[in-house]
Amino acid sequence: DSPKIEYTLRTIKSVIRSCEIAKRSFKDINIKIIISDDNSNQENLDKINQILQSTNIETQIISIKDNEFNDTISSVDTNGDKISDNMISNMRNILKSIQIAESDNSDLFYFLEDDYIHVDDAITEMLFTYEKISSQINDELFLCPADYPYLYSSIESSKIFFGNMRHWRTVNETLITFLTSKIMITKYIDKLKLMGTKRHHPMELMLHEIYEKEYCLSPIPSLTMHATNINSMYGVPPNFDWKKIWDENK
């Protein structure tokens, strides 16, 4: 029942801490945290900036301009129904994140919604796992940091991999938080942009179509908690000490 900004602040704190821990294992890695912002009020921006100033990791807030992308976002969904202003804001953030990834030549990109609180070793585990599994399958892939409860609501076959300190299983669905490579972004840029220009049902449908062709893995147990939907099938993962993670990121 906390205000939405509280989820965001704890998400940022947890990601920063996890990135700082990851740099101990990956000495030469260059990590940059970029926040796309769509008209947050100054009070909330000040709170975010205060957290960003506490780390030596490179950080940046990029504000989405007024009416940016509005001409490319369809005002109706695939059913012909008008979409809400809040949904348009979400889609603007998706398009801004993809735009940033398009113009940057980093090897890996982690697209993160603003309500995922991470365990300390989340980034370390994802980096080691990506490196290991991509070599094992001789290809790029997608990693989702959350072991969503809803993924157990149907009976699906999974392939099991061993990452760094966790098992990972193949999944066919995620929300819009995932890690992948620049190669994959370039390969599927049109589908990724469709998530921001047309409201599908589910919103992540284009991702799910990509996962029909590419590996997407999620960890067992989870590396993150989807805080906004904590009481739903998209919230607290199995065998996850949510209160500990919540309290550690005050």
For each of these PLM feature ranges, what is it?
Residues 4-7, 11-29:
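Short, acidic, metal-binding catalytic loop of nucleotide-sugar glycosyltransferases
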Residues 90-95, 123, 172-176, 197-208:
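Conserved glycosyltransferase catalytic-site signature
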